């Protein structure tokens, strides 16, 4: 290794030092660059005694010997070729390949899903918690739901009765808060459910009154749906075909919470808190905050969220400024004025920023907002499914804004979602 000196390198160009900078002291750069040309052997990077940001190595014709050529051997110097590369300050040419290999080893791909439900793709005999991952199950589930036919006023049967159980208000004939004028034939119920699920039904399906319902050992995409018919109020004078929400329409709903993903029970408090806030406040006032201590895992979560529709994502690394304790006088003055809400404005004084440094804390943070309540809840569901894989890396928090915030392109979606009303009988 040859040390830096005028005998070994040739300074081709050097920019002047810039002493003044608006950056903090620990982030201030000298903005000085030199271009050097080695004359013999290797060159140490960075050169000794030079405060530079980048060093450019320029090949020369006299790099094999330090002795000047004789007069008879002098030839016109060919123009210098452009530098092949620019090495950052502190880079060693000898360790450059090792550095690249180290950087490549850091490019770790995190698999955000693991086998969870269903059957193993290679071994169908394996079933249980270590068989199918949630992403495959949710994809197949949503694909199956999209295939179902949504009944409208024209295609719905003439007499349909849907019982939603004891969860809906009682005292209404027909069950589930449906109008009393709806037919109560069990054959029509089975036919409607089969038409929604797309399963052929026998001509005369007879269900015994004392039949017992057994829990299937695995998820069946054709057995855990039930149709919910939204009837137009009887007081509406308009015809059902042109009534509110397009008249009588049948939608597919899950049968119960047994088919929820496994992470739903683990992060139950998060879903309940988001649902509570969205019942009390508008979706434009609720935001989801995620913190992560690993940059690669944070980028994996960010990439997954950016594949969702109708969401806004703000992500970055947390910065902390210079830490300075408060004087007892400042603490006493602040607490004295803030004891009385009517005297809060009396303690406001001009603030002079005096922090001389800042640095990164190593924590990555992300704020997610949705165009509608459903979009925000979908973002929470996706985050919970990914965070569940690495609970020691992520942290989920729900924040309530004092002023609503929504992206301008999301306004039409928001207005359409909020204008939809479920008709009551």
Curated annotation (Swiss-Prot):
Record keywords, A-Z: Host nucleus
Entry's Gene Ontology cellular component terms: host cell nucleus
Pfam families per record: Herpes_IE2_3
Ranges for region Disordered: 59-83
Biological process terms in GO annotation: regulation of DNA-templated transcription
Family listed: Belongs to the herpesviridae U84 family.
Function: Plays a role in the inhibition of host DNA replication in the infected cell. Targets the mini-chromosome maintenance (MCM) complex and blocks the accumulation of MCM proteins and their loading onto host chromatin.
Protein name per the record: Protein UL117
């Amino acid at each position: 290794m040859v040390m830096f000196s005028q005998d070994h390198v040739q300074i081709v160009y050097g920019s002047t030092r810039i002493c003044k900078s608006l950056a903090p002291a620990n982030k201030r750069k000298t903005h000085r660059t030199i271009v050097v040309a080695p004359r013999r052997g290797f060159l140490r990077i960075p050169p000794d005694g030079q405060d530079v940001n980048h060093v450019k190595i320029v090949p020369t014709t006299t790099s094999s010997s330090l002795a000047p050529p004789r007069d008879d051997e002098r030839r016109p110097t060919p123009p210098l070729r452009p530098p092949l590369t620019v090495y950052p300050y502190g880079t060693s040419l000898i360790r450059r390949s090792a550095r690249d290999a180290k950087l490549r080893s850091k490019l770790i791909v995190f698999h955000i899903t693991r086998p969870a439900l269903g059957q193993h793709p290679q071994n169908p005999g394996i079933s249980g918690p270590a068989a199918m991952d949630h992403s495959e199950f949710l994809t197949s589930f949503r694909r199956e739901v999209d295939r179902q036919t949504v009944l409208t006023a024209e295609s719905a049967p003439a007499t349909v009765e849907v019982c939603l159980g004891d969860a809906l208000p009682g005292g209404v004939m027909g069950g589930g808060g449906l109008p009393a004028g709806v037919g109560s034939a069990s054959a029509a119920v089975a036919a409607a459910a089969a038409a929604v699920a797309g399963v052929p039904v026998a001509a005369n399906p007879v269900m015994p009154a004392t039949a017992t319902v057994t829990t299937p050992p695995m998820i069946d995409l054709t057995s855990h749906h039930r149709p919910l018919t939204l009837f137009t109020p009887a007081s509406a004078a308009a015809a059902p075909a042109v009534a509110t929400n397009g008249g009588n329409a049948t939608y597919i709903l899950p049968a119960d919470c047994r088919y929820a993903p496994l992470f739903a029970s683990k992060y139950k408090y998060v879903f309940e808190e988001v649902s509570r806030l969205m019942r009390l406040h508008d979706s434009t006032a609720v935001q989801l905050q995620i913190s992560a201590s690993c940059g690669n895992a944070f980028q994996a979560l960010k990439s997954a969220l950016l594949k969702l529709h109708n969401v806004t994502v703000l992500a970055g690394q947390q910065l902390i400024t210079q830490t300075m304790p408060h004087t007892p006088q400042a603490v006493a003055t602040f607490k004295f004025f803030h004891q009385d809400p009517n005297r809060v404005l009396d303690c406001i004084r001009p603030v002079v920023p005096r922090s001389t440094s800042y640095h990164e804390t190593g924590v990555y943070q992300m704020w997610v907002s949705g165009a509608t309540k459903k979009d925000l809840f979908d973002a929470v569901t996706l985050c919970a499914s990914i965070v569940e894989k690495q609970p020691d890396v992520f942290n989920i928090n729900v924040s309530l804004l004092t002023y609503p915030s929504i992206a301008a392109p999301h306004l039409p979606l928001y207005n359409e979602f909020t204008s939809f009303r479920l008709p009551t009988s």
